[in-house]
């Protein structure tokens, strides 16, 4: 495989690429309070992006590696879109966020190519894929360099999957009225068909960001994991996010009886952040096809409908929402009106009785997902479970919460 040559071809300078923070042209709120969240990281002065250390470390990145790349970005004296924000260096060069993380990924890519041990090589490929995804973060539409980093991440992920334990199959799903989408089915050792979890990820993540979830939590329990990208990013980039947020996942669910490795009678959905919006919609609209739905830090009502809550959210996250909705130059008022339509309570779903068992995990004082959203989910279910996850120590409690959630899913699938 000529991965290095592909990197050179994709990133070859052709014109002045737009800088990430300029892609969504909203009216800024001005000064914002500091934000810290287990799933989204924290706002740090002089950075446009939220720095999501917990999730990056959870995905296998060494904390020192994160600091090294950040230091290279900070030390750059190249031209920036905003002199006050380190990660706004213009163009694919030293100091640019995408450049520095992609360069770091290429180091691991080279290690993977040089490594003779297949499993270790697979680990290096996975590491490279994760770093390329961080390079592309927060995956805004129209970010040419980020889209090229995503392409490299997908290639590295495919290389990793050929070498790591278990089996991964790349699958194409037909969606009427538009382009087909691609998903990854991760299967544990043994003979299928397997009970399967359909992963519904957050808006600022790619489907390839969840390998750790499969490897540490689902595979040891003999459960397969099926991922697809959220609308408007990655392999689903030709689909815009609409109020029918679960459209793509519904078509995947309906196709599962034709997938021989999946036991379509034992399927659950698991939603992170806005992915919970998708998962809970599935619980209502596709209850005969689902044994259970689990959510973590769900974005299903408050953030979408409460102006005060939206004011507490960092600029980057609002840019992500605007980008997914195709509202790159809309006013904040227009964005608020549109977001309100995505509330599952406003849509008339949440609050109605749902036959599907639903669990929702939350952190107290989470700026993106208050406890009320999780209570709304679990109280709407005929078999609901509310799970509070203490914030500190953040990594240990995150792991403990995931163990409890996957155990709950296993009981309903197996």
Curated annotation (Swiss-Prot):
Q: Name one GO molecular function term.
A: carboxylesterase activity
**Domain of life of the source:** Bacteria
**Which function does this protein serve?**
Catalyzes the hydrolysis of esters.
- Catalytic EC class: hydrolase
Q: Which HAMAP family match?
A: FrsA
Give the organism's phylogenetic lineage: Bacteria, Pseudomonadati, Pseudomonadota, Gammaproteobacteria, Enterobacterales
Q: Which InterPro entries match?
A: AB_hydrolase_fold, FrsA, FrsA-like, FrsA_esterase
What is the gene called?
A: frsA
Q: What is its EC number?
A: 3.1.1.1
Origin organism is Shigella sonnei (strain Ss046)
Q: What is this protein called?
A: Esterase FrsA
């Amino acid at each position: 495989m000529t991965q290095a040559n592909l990197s050179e071809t994709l990133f070859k300078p052709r014109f002045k690429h737009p800088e990430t923070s300029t892609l969504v042209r909203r009216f800024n709120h001005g000064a914002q309070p500091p934000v810290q969240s287990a799933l989204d990281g924290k706002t740090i002065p002089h950075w446009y992006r939220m720095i999501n250390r917990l999730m990056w470390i959870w995905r296998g990145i060494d904390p020192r590696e994160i600091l090294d790349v950040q230091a290279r970005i900070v030390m750059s004296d190249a031209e920036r879109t905003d002199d006050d924000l380190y990660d706004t260096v213009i163009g694919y060069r030293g100091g640019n966020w995408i450049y520095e993380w992609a360069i770091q990924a290429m180091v691991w890519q080279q290690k993977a190519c040089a490594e003779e041990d297949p499993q270790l090589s697979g680990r290096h490929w996975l590491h490279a894929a994760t770093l390329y995804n961080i390079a592309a973060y927060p995956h805004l539409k129209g970010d040419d360099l980020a889209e090229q980093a995503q392409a490299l991440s997908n290639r590295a992920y495919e290389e990793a999957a050929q070498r790591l334990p278990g089996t991964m199959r790349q699958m194409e799903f037909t969606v009427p009225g538009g382009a087909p989408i691609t998903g990854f089915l991760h299967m544990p050792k043994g003979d299928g068909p397997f009970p399967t979890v359909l992963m519904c990820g957050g808006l600022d993540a790619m489907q390839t960001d969840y390998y750790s979830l499969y490897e540490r939590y689902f595979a040891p329990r003999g459960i397969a994991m099926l991922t697809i990208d959220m609308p408007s990013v990655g392999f689903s980039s030709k689909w815009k996010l609409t109020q029918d947020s679960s459209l793509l996942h519904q078509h995947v669910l309906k196709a599962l009886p034709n997938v021989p490795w999946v036991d379509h009678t034992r399927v659950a959905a698991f939603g992170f952040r806005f992915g919970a919006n998708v998962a809970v919609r599935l619980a209502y609209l596709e209850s005969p096809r689902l044994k259970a739905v689990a959510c973590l830090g769900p974005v299903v009502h408050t953030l979408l409908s409460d102006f005060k809550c939206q004011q507490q959210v960092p600029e980057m996250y609002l840019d992500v929402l605007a980008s997914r909705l195709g509202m790159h130059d809309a006013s904040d008022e227009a964005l608020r009106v549109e977001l309100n339509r995505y509330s599952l309570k406003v849509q008339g779903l949440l609050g109605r009785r749902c036959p599907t068992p639903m669990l929702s995990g939350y952190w107290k004082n989470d700026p993106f997902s208050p406890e009320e959203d999780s209570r709304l989910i679990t109280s709407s279910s005929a078999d609901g479970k509310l799970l509070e996850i203490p914030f500190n120590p953040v990594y240990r409690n995150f792991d403990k919460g995931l163990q409890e959630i996957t155990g709950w899913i296993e009981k309903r699938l197996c």
